[in-house]
Structure formats: structure tokens, C-alpha cells
A protein has these predicted regions:
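Bergerat-fold GHKL ATPase/HATPase_c domain
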Residues: 1-112, 121-124, 236-277, 281, ...
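Conserved beta-strand-loop-beta-strand hairpin that lines the nucleotide-binding pocket
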Residues: 54, 59-74, 118-235
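A short acidic, amphipathic alpha-helical/loop segment
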Residues: 188, 274, 302-303
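Short acidic, S/G/P-rich loop/turn micro-motifs used as interaction or catalytic elements
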Residues: 230-231, 262-265, 292-295
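Short, glycine-/small-residue-enriched flexible loop/hinge segments at domain edges that mediate gating
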Residues: 281-294
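A short acidic (Asp/Glu
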Residues: 296-301, 327-329
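Short, non-transmembrane amphipathic alpha-helical segments
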Residues: 299-310
Length: 339
């Protein structure tokens, strides 16, 4: 370990132990790393200047506290005693202290939902959790060494491939354990955060391009980002996907671009049927054509005429269409209306 790496290790340990040693952190770290008190105090001064620590008092009465900049990372074995609420409360809640109530609520919701998914579904042995905040954003990363979310969904739901598993996950109401889960956790978590990504063995589910991480080769990694000035609330997002005065999750948004494999065009009825899988679970379905430059006549006809006529109780709404896409959809809708 070179001097730079050793310095980072010391600072990391200070931040990890500061809450347990607010008054004796200098002596504790000096003993732990066999360094002088002056060396520790230099690290403390730097951390305070950077916003990672704050202090009160002077001399022997000086106390240190976490600053506005905070982070915590740890790894835990997935034992029967490990629970999402306990690890939040005992290990990570301090990272979010002092933030707006809506921000804390969103972070706790996403944190506990994704950790619970690992506990109940990953079949892994270890979980690693990282939480970070600076002046502008909060980042939460949760990774496991299990089978991999898309591989497991493909296997248990008998889907064509892992890409189809990703696509079904994006719709919502997908669970491999219907007796104990609603399939809504990932759907809503991905929408309450400003950025959300799942990376599992090279297959990525993302609502943004704000992350730049090395692909996860084993298990599953979930990345969540929330801006500190967000006014979003969990309730407002839930209301967006439930009808007026209803408590049922009855609306979904389907990112049509996920149905494309590589450079292929969306032209066939088989592709459309893959898109339509399980949408009978919803009353309102928005087809988001963002990033789709063109579609074929058969693809449009299968969704907006054939399926629409056989499912009149489901509202199918295309959005974010380029002109070529809009023309093809309008043609299919006109054919339906004229019959």
C-alpha cells in the first residue's frame, strides 16, 4: 500500500468510526494505524475543510460529527438475521439525516425495497451497500453475488431471453414470488429517483444515462441517484400510476425502444406481441416511442388495431412519436375505427 492509498484508508476509517468516537477519534485512529496524533489531526483538518466532518469545542473538549458530505460502504453476509430495516436504521440512516423529509422518504423506500429484493430473490451469499451524499445529490448502490435478476426472471417466467426479462421488468407487476410480492417495488423505485439503473451480467435496465460504472459480471447491482433539491414525493409518483380515487396500480409506461434487439427495426407482429405481453394487467398503457425512428405497418397494426379491438377496456396511448411513427400508428387506428 503506497502513501496515498494509506492516507485514503485512514480517512475512510475516520469517517466510519466518527460517530462511535466523537471525542477520542484522534487517539483511536492513531492507535489503530500506529501513527502520530499530529498525523491524525492533519487528516481531521482536511476532512473538515472538505465538508466531511464538522466539530465543536476546543482542546480536550472538542467533538467531531459527520459533516454535510457523507458516505458509508459495507458488505454483509446474507444470513437469516439480516433485514433491510435494521441495516438502514443501524448502519446507513445517518447518511440521510438533515435532508428534506421527501428526500429521506424516497431514499428509505428505495434502499429498503432493493435490499429486500436481494434478501428474498438473489439466492446470493453477500450484499454490498454504498450510500453517498454531496451538496447536490444522493447516490445509493446495492450489489449482490447471486444468480442475476434478469437470468432468474427468464428462467422462472419461461421467457425468450434475458432481454425480454428486462423488458417485462420495465412494465411493472412482474414478480417471481406472487404470494409475497406485488412486483411493484422496482417499478416505483425506478420512478421516484432521478436516475435508476440495474446492471446484471452485462444486461442493463436504465431510466437515464447518468451512471458510468464498469459492468457487473456477477449477481446484480442497482444504482439510484436523487437530486437534493427534488420536490418529488412517493405519493405523487404513486398517484401518477393509479387512477383518481383508486388504490390500484393500473397504469404503466412501456419504453418501446427496449423491444429492439441491436439494430433491428420494429416491423413484425411477433415483435408487437412481445411488447404486449402482460399488459392486460393494466387499464392505461402509454407506449413511449422516444428513440424509435420508424416502425412497420404490421407492428403498428398488431398493437393499435388487432389488440385494441380485442381489449376495448384497455386504453392504449402512444407518446413521444416521430412523424414516421405517428403516421403508421394513425393508419392502424383509422383502420380500427372504420370497421
Amino acid at each position: 500500500m503506497n502513501n496515498k492509498e494509506r492516507g485514503e484508508s485512514i480517512r475512510h476509517q475516520i469517517l466510519k468510526d466518527i460517530r462511535q468516537h466523537p471525542t477520542d477519534i484522534s487517539r483511536y485512529i492513531a492507535d489503530s494505524f500506529s501513527i502520530t496524533l499530529q498525523a491524525v489531526n492533519n487528516h481531521l483538518k482536511r476532512l473538515e475543510e472538505e465538508g466531511w466532518l464538522q466539530s465543536s469545542g476546543r482542546g480536550k473538549g472538542k467533538r467531531y460529527f459527520p459533516g454535510d458530505m457523507r458516505e458509508y460502504r459495507s458488505q454483509f453476509p446474507l444470513t437469516v438475521d439480516f433485514t433491510e430495516d435494521a441495516v438502514w436504521r443501524e448502519q446507513y440512516s445517518f447518511v440521510f439525516e438533515g435532508l428534506q423529509e421527501n428526500i429521506v422518504d424516497i431514499c428509505q423506500y428505495g434502499f429498503t425495497e432493493m435490499v429486500n429484493n436481494v434478501i428474498d430473490h438473489s439466492d446470493g451469499t453477500l450484499i454490498e451497500i454504498y450510500a453517498f451524499r454531496d451538496k447536490e445529490r444522493i447516490v445509493i448502490i446495492i450489489a449482490d453475488d447471486g444468480e442475476g435478476i434478469f437470468k432468474k426472471i427468464k428462467r422462472l417466467c419461461d421467457l425468450q431471453d434475458e432481454r425480454q426479462a428486462l423488458f417485462e421488468l420495465s412494465k411493472g407487476k412482474l414478480t417471481t414470488d406472487p404470494d409475497n410480492h406485488t412486483g411493484e417495488g422496482i417499478f416505483f423505485t425506478s420512478r421516484v429517483f432521478d436516475a435508476f439503473e440495474i446492471d446484471s451480467k452485462g444486461v442493463k435496465f436504465s431510466h437515464s444515462d447518468q451512471f458510468d460504472f464498469i459492468g457487473n459480471e456477477s449477481g446484480t447491482a442497482v444504482y439510484m441517484l436523487l437530486k437534493r433539491d427534488s420536490n418529488r414525493t412517493i405519493q405523487s409518483v404513486f398517484d401518477d400510476y393509479a387512477g383518481p380515487d383508486e388504490f390500484q396500480f393500473n397504469k404503466t409506461v412501456i419504453p418501446v425502444r427496449l423491444a429492439q434487439y441491436g439494430n433491428e427495426k420494429l416491423v413484425s407482429r411477433s415483435q408487437a406481441k412481445r411488447l404486449l405481453l402482460r399488459i392486460e394487467l393494466f387499464q392505461n398503457v402509454l407506449f413511449d416511442f422516444d428513440g424509435v425512428s420508424a416502425i412497420g405497418q404490421a407492428f403498428a397494426d398488431e398493437i393499435f388495431r388487432v389488440y385494441a379491438q380485442s381489449h376495448p377496456d384497455i386504453d392504449l396511448v402512444p407518446v413521444k412519436m416521430e412523424e414516421n411513427v405517428k403516421k403508421m400508428i394513425n393508419r392502424a387506428i383509422s383502420s380500427r375505427v372504420s370497421k
